[in-house]
């Protein structure tokens, strides 16, 4: 099974339009005025640390025998994981990394952003 997990952080006081942000920023890779810039290098370093027992084919592609694989796509404002055959615990580990940077998960499979803990 494959799925994508998407993360961003809104600027303070802007209107939230999750579907538009997903399409424009996460799918098309375009900058969006309503979003904060993210510390992408720090995020990638944290991902590499958390998944240090996985094979890193490069900074954006990870795989592990029997555990699946994932690809990381970033712009200065978003992080998107395309996940293939991953276990729930590993998916949760990806989510935890981005939550640590104040970025809630948006799941396009159900058109839901899990942001009840933040207004950003």
Regions found by a protein language model. Give the residues of each.
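Acidic (Asp/Glu-rich) sequence patches and key acidic residues
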Residues: 1-120
């Amino acid at each position: 099974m494959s799925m994508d997990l998407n993360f961003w952080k809104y600027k303070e006081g802007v209107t939230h339009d999750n579907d538009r942000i997903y399409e424009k920023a996460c799918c098309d890779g375009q900058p969006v005025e309503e979003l904060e810039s993210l510390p992408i290098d720090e995020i990638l370093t944290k991902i590499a640390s958390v998944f240090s027992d996985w094979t890193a084919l490069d900074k954006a592609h990870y795989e592990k025998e029997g555990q699946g694989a994932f690809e990381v796509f970033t712009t200065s404002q978003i992080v998107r994981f395309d996940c293939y055959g991953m276990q729930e615990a590993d998916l949760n580990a990806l989510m935890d990394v981005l939550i640590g940077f104040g970025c809630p998960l948006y799941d396009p499979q159900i058109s839901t952003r899990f942001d009840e803990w933040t207004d950003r």
